[in-house]
Amino acid sequence: MKRNEIVIDGRLLKRGTLRHTPAGIPALNLLIGHKSIQIEAGGRREARCEVEAVAIGDLAVRLSTQKLNQPLQLSGFLTRHSVKDGRLVLHVVGVEPIGNGTE
């Protein structure tokens, strides 16, 4: 199995302090809030979640100044938080603004 691609619309709820990895690469922890209506088994279902995410490199620097609560489309892949912590984390590899922030 190779496929591990996530695209999600959400809002930047929290942003950590820009830090650097031991290799000197910028890194930024994020919390993304998502809310939508999805179709499941022919019915409408409200989907809500908060997703832990991390951005690395130039994207981390760019997101370190992103205004909170702005609608964004994020793309990336899922992996575990660390060797000892199995929580899922979205590693963001792409970000695009959505609309004018009124959605």
Language-model-derived ranges and their functions:
Residues M1-E103:
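Single-stranded nucleic acid-binding surfaces, predominantly the OB-fold ssDNA-binding core
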